[in-house]
Amino acid sequence: NNSSRSVEQYVKKLEKMGIPAAENDVLLSTHDCIAWLNRNNVNETYCVGTEGMRQMLEAEGISTRSTQPQYVVLGYDTETTYERLEKASLHLHAGVPLMASHPDMVCPSPDGGLPDVGAFLALFKATTGVEATHISGKPNPGMILHKIEELGLKPEECAMVGDRLYTDIAMANRANCM
């Protein structure tokens, strides 16, 4: 559910760890976000997300810095600025709907939890009164079902291993995986 890096960045990270990987081996909540935006014909957004996330959206023809966005898109933005949050808030006050890449409240770190997308969703609700109309990523079963189909498998032939019951295991249950 981490949308802070692009697929290319994750492949490089895995390779540095000695794990060979190709881009099609990596599945991110950003993929689910892009699929949802495309299904809903959204190509003008204001994205609160990292450069890696914005590059993935832009590569799919989705503008991420529109002055007249169809949606404010919220990802795990480890590079955010007050100005970015302010612009997103103003769009939300103007009636632009909000969608998010995933619901996680906390991103674990060795030194303690860090604010993740869910925490920023709470911030926007508190400051603008706006709640997300859609949240992509886990626990949405669509996050994994398209990959299962692409691999020619059935959900009941797949098992999920994860560290969070409310995202990883909930998604597996909703997708009818083991």
What are these regions (language model features)?
Residues N1-M178:
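HAD-like aspartate-dependent phosphatase fold
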